[in-house]
Structures are given as structure tokens and as C-alpha cells.
């Protein structure tokens, strides 16, 4: 059996950025021990030296929601400061701390979502319409990043299926496509290819219709009982807990129903590394690291972090495995 080494920070971080960061830390006289810390910890050290002063997001507003027993997990929650401070949102930078540092000025007042394509009722809804129309509930979900780290997060939102039924897709609609806000003035990574990882923006994602209708698929508007902070995808994002995190598109402004399979940003950028389905699967490795285990964020310190086995479909096989019956999960990763 072929043995896979554990991914290093250089594997999951763009190479040029990884070595540039190390050169800067050395120039600041940072010790060799600090250079051996994870990339995100090195970013924290740099932030301490920079003392950057950027707009801070206003505190989240408390939400009213139910707490159905069916959606609780007997697992400890990831600390809130980790959920809101350790993020991938390349529109605001590549480091895990960048979104929290750079997204504070994102304007979400008057936010609207356009819904069109193969639907009976094309329409545009603002975020307040959605909050009034669809009752909210809290769901505690596992979250698994393709970079082999994980969290347990208490999202607040409503089933995507409820919005789909409201829009009344036609029989032609086989997929649901999503698009993030495109606003380079607010999202600096969209105009700076280095800061934004060289991706083509706006960020886009998609699901098969049966995936989108699964009760697990959530449109989240809050976390930890409050409205989403910008770095977590305010004011509305997708949560599909059986899929890797890059499928969970943030700051959605457009939902389109289509007959054709929609493009997906990471699949376009690196199709051999990021598939359309992106189902969590410990038996199908990323080309550069194993997916058999995951680092549990919030456990231990920087040098003593718990790892645990990754579960097929992130532990949600009972709810979603039937969606992929007869599909080769290795080829359709």
C-alpha cells in the first residue's frame, strides 16, 4: 500500500507566498523555532509586528431561531474565535487570519440575491425578505476543509430546499449555480492576483439539483446565534457539510437554475485537484496529501494539535450516500 506523508504548510500554501513569508520573518530576526510554526501562526506573528489598523466589522446581531434536536451533535464546538478567525476567503487574502483582518468594511446592508434561470418565478430578494420568509434554525455541523483540517460549527439558517421550492424551478433545471459578490473595491483579492491566489473571480459554485434539495444543504445567515461576520461569508452563504469547505460558497448574490453543469472556481483553477462533487472521502487523496485524517482546529496548542480519522461524507453517509449510488467516487471526486 502506498503511504502518504502528512501535508506540510508548503503543500497547502502557494509556494511563492510560503517562501516570501519565511524571508520576511528572518529579516525581522524571528527565531528558527518560529519559522517551524504553521504558516497561519507565522501570519499571526507578522500581524503583531505590522499593527495594521483596518475597519472592524460591527458585532453580529442576535438572531431568533429554533434548535431542533435532530441537528445537534454530541461533539464539542470549535471555539468561536477560531471559527471567526481561521478562514479561507481569498477575496480578502490568502492567510487564515486575512479575512478577519481585511473584511471588516464589507457592506451588507440592502444586500440582494438574484434568482433566475430555469424557474417559474425569477425574482430578486433582499436579505431581510429572506429572514422574514424562512424561519431560522440552528444546526451543528461538522466542517471539513480540503486542506485536512476540521471544525464543529453551530450555523443558523434555513434549508436551501425551501428557497428552491419557493422559486419553482422548471423540469429543465438539473443544477443550481451560485455566485459570490464581485466588488474589487470591497474585496481586494479580486483585483490583486497575488492577494487573491490567482483565481478567476467572481467565485462560483454549483450543486446537482438532488444535492441542493437534500435536507442537509443549508443557507446560513448566522453562526453562534448571531449574524455572520464578513469573514465567514456574510450575509448569506452555503453550507453542505458532507462536502469540502470550498464548495460552501460565501457572500452569495446570484442563484441560477440551469440544465448544464455550472462552472466551479476551484475546479476551473485545478481540475486534477478539486472535483465538481468535492465529497469528503478519506479513501480519495488530494494529489499532494492524504485525506485519511484531519487536524482538529481548537484542540491543543500550536505544537500539539489533535488529529482524527476522516469519515466518509464527513460522517453524513446515512443522509447522502444514496445520492451517489452507482457513481464511481474515485473518478467523480
UniProtKB/Swiss-Prot annotation:
Cross-referenced InterPro entries: MsrP, OxRdtase_Mopterin-bd_dom, OxRdtase_Mopterin-bd_sf, TAT_signal
GO biological process: protein repair
Cofactor(s) required for function per UniProt: Mo-molybdopterin
Leader sequence residues: 1-43
Binding site for Mo-molybdopterin: 87, 90-91, 145, 180, 232, 237, 248-250
Listed EC numbers: 1.8.5.-
Annotated GO CC locations: periplasmic space
Residue runs in coiled coils: none
GO molecular function terms listed in the Swiss-Prot or TrEMBL record: metal ion binding; molybdopterin cofactor binding; oxidoreductase activity, acting on a sulfur group of donors, quinone or similar compound as acceptor
Subcellular location(s) of the protein: Periplasm
Subunit description: Heterodimer of a catalytic subunit (MsrP) and a heme-binding subunit (MsrQ).
UniProt xrefs under NCBIfam families: PRK05363.1 (NF003767)
Protein name: Protein-methionine-sulfoxide reductase catalytic subunit MsrP
Naturally occurring in which organism (per UniProt): Pectobacterium carotovorum subsp. carotovorum (strain PC1)
Amino acid at each position: 500500500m502506498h503511504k502518504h506523508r502528512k501535508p506540510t504548510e508548503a503543500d497547502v500554501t502557494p509556494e511563492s507566498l510560503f517562501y516570501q513569508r519565511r524571508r520576511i520573518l528572518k529579516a525581522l530576526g524571528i527565531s528558527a523555532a518560529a519559522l517551524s510554526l504553521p504558516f497561519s501562526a507565522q501570519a499571526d506573528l507578522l500581524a503583531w509586528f505590522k499593527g495594521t489598523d483596518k475597519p472592524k466589522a460591527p458585532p453580529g446581531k442576535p438572531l431568533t431561531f429554533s434548535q431542533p434536536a435532530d441537528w445537534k451533535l454530541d461533539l464539542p464546538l470549535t471555539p468561536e474565535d477560531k471559527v471567526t478567525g481561521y478562514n479561507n476567503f481569498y477575496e480578502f487574502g490568502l492567510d487564515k487570519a486575512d479575512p478577519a483582518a481585511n473584511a471588516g468594511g464589507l457592506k451588507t446592508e440592502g444586500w440582494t440575491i438574484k434568482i433566475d434561470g430555469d424557474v417559474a418565478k425569477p425574482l430578486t430578494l433582499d436579505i431581510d425578505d429572506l429572514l422574514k420568509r424562512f424561519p431560522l434554525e440552528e444546526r451543528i455541523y461538522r466542517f471539513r476543509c480540503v486542506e485536512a483540517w476540521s471544525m464543529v460549527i453551530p450555523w443558523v439558517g434555513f434549508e436551501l430546499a425551501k428557497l428552491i421550492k419557493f422559486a419553482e424551478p422548471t423540469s429543465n433545471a438539473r443544477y443550481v449555480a451560485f455566485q459570490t459578490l464581485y466588488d474589487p473595491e470591497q474585496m481586494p483579492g479580486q483585483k490583486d492576483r497575488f492577494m487573491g491566489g490567482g483565481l478567476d473571480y467572481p467565485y462560483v459554485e454549483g450543486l446537482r439539483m438532488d444535492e441542493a434539495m437534500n435536507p442537509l444543504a443549508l443557507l446560513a445567515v448566522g453562526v453562534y446565534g448571531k449574524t455572520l461576520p464578513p469573514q465567514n461569508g456574510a450575509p448569506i452563504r452555503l453550507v453542505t457539510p458532507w462536502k469540502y469547505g470550498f464548495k460552501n460558497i460565501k457572500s452569495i448574490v446570484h442563484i441560477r437554475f440551469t440544465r448544464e453543469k455550472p462552472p466551479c472556481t476551484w475546479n476551473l483553477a485545478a481540475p486534477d485537484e478539486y472535483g465538481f462533487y468535492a465529497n469528503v472521502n478519506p479513501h480519495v487523496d488530494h494529489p499532494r496529501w492524504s485525506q485519511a485524517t484531519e487536524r482538529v482546529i481548537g484542540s491543543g496548542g500550536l505544537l500539539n494539535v489533535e488529529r482524527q480519522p476522516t469519515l466518509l461524507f464527513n460522517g453524513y453517509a446515512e443522509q447522502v450516500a444514496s445520492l451517489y449510488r452507482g457513481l464511481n467516487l474515485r473518478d467523480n471526486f
